[in-house]
Amino acid sequence: MKSMLNKISKPIELNLEEFDKCFNESLDSEVKTINTIVKYLVRKKGKRLRPRLSLLSAKICGDINLKTYKVASLLEILHVATLVHDDVVDDSDLRRGWPSVGRIWKNKLSILVGDYLFSKALTNMADIDSMDSVKILANLASRLSQGEILQIEKALSKNINEEVYFKMISDKTASLFSASCKLGAITATKDPTKIEALSQFGEFLGQAYQIKDDLFDIVGNIGNTGKPSGYDLKKNMLTLPLIYILDKKTNLERKIFKFNLKMMLRKNNFNKIKN
């Protein structure tokens, strides 16, 4: 995936370097503890999918400019903030194969640093000075929250179907991909057709990305996912592969399957689940 990502991003190679500068400058704080935790969070660049989408969208529609870098930075900051809060909600010890912020600095600081990052994202938004962009960001924040709450609600009730699943991943994952494309486009054009087309592209790409992540939870490993196999299943998250498996079974078969799955997860015998 990395080689393909680099190939797709060839037109914005130099722009990514400029983005890195803008992103790092946006995170500075006068509080030493915040800087320490933030540096730990961003020590590895990761794939930077969302900034790439913003930059590429602007490039497609016109020219990349200062507002594009601000948009790309605020979206990556927002993404990092949601990861910090997600790890608290999910009680996660690992993030991309490394100890989570909560594991090292505990949940109180995790939540507060996540809040700090949200505030820095808002600061970047203010610099863009665009009411349309503010509305997109507000809608994004609403969708992200609703998606996470819906996931928790359905995990507790264990009642989820394909329709609910796509609503959930659209809000908690695809919304950020869509906003990345849409905001990037807005910095380079006023053409509503282009802006909406890129927004829809981001939405579908985000859904596909989440489905791939669900599959990796079953067939992947900590080396390529940054988390142990079966992590989502252990957290009672009903992913699309599991929904399709259960859909083909009778009520009795579902109960037996869920019981066996629970026993295998408890014994960490994940190879049997893969088979």
Where are these regions (language model features)?
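Charged, compositionally biased N-terminal leader segments and the immediate start
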Residues: 1-10
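Mg2+-dependent prenyl diphosphate-binding active-site environment of isoprenoid biosynthetic enzymes
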Residues: 13, 17-18, 22-254
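Alpha-helix capping and helix-coil boundary motifs
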Residues: 4, 191, 263-267
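Mobile late-domain/C-terminal helix-loop "cap" segments
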Residues: 256-275
